[in-house]
């Protein structure tokens, strides 16, 4: 028989800390506005605090050497990830096979999703459910100004 008093305080407190948190964060900005540098810096800084593994997904290998070696790098172009459904399946597969991921960073998101911001409202709701169920955070760089994005996606802006 398991009693509440048998649970470690870490388990209970980590569950409480996740409640109400936004598990998706988006960095908006046009090309050349510093989004990639910011997301690379965030990924490198998160290695110290992350309770699990840190992943970085991009559409090519150009920033591989900019990341700390503890970060798992995935070049999505090697897996033909182009479109919303393939991207979702790719992410779901990664999370299904790796229970120890605490945060995923995605650069060049619009290139991978191949969609206009207005077409991503329902997709973001699906992504939020996916990463919340996996108890993982998702940080995305989005090559568009925030004012050109639906409000339901803008709420994730950091």
Regions found by a protein language model. Give the residues of each.
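Amphipathic alpha-helical interface surfaces
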Residues: 35, 83, 87-90, 101, ...
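Conserved P-loop
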Residues: 22-94, 149-151
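Charged, low-complexity C-terminal accessory regions
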Residues: 17-18, 158
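Generic beta-sheet signal
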Residues: 25-27, 54, 101-106, 138
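Single conserved hydrophobic/aromatic residue that forms the stacking wall/gate
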Residues: 1-15
